[in-house]
């Protein structure tokens, strides 16, 4: 039996975790978050493998989403600042029909008003935010892909 493959995408400035605003994002680096997720998945989900991609470039993120269409069983995205600005990432998410979850370390609704809206939320099945690095592992308590694969995505219009 082949393993399911989950693609994680981390957007701009997430490579600065541990240095950038630790009072908001915590002290763990992105590499430490990824190692924690890999360990958690290996211990609890033998049938799942994970891959991580981080970019500060919108186009690179769009390309990674497109590639995930044919390679991944699911996609987890922390769009960072692009969550609040990127129609291009939303459109890319709407082109793939695998289960998708948006995650954020901070609670967007306790932050500045401009962070309260995420364009990319329309292109995913669910959103997890506000649990710091634990947001990356909480998604494994969400419904399985078979539970959400039949749900309809809203129109981008």
Where are these regions (language model features)?
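Flexible, gly/pro- and Lys/Arg-enriched active-site loops
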Residues: 79-82, 87-138
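N-terminal nucleotide-binding beta1-loop-alpha1 segment
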Residues: 8-15
């Amino acid at each position: 039996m082949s393993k399911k493959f989950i693609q994680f995408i981390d957007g701009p400035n997430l490579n600065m975790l541990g240095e950038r605003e630790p009072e908001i994002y915590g002290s763990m680096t992105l590499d430490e978050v990824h190692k924690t997720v890999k360990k958690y998945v290996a211990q609890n989900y033998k049938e799942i493998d994970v891959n991580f991609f981080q970019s500060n470039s919108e186009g690179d993120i769009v390309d990674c989403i497109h590639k995930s269409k044919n390679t991944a069983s699911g996609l987890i995205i922390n769009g960072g600042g692009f969550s609040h600005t990127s129609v291009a990432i939303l459109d890319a998410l709407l082109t793939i029909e695998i289960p998708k979850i948006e995650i954020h370390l901070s609670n967007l609704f306790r932050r500045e008003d401009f962070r309260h809206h995420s364009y990319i939320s329309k292109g995913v099945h669910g959103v997890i935010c506000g649990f710091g690095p634990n947001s990356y592992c909480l998604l494994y308590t969400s419904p399985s892909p078979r539970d959400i694969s039949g749900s309809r995505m809203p129109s981008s219009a």
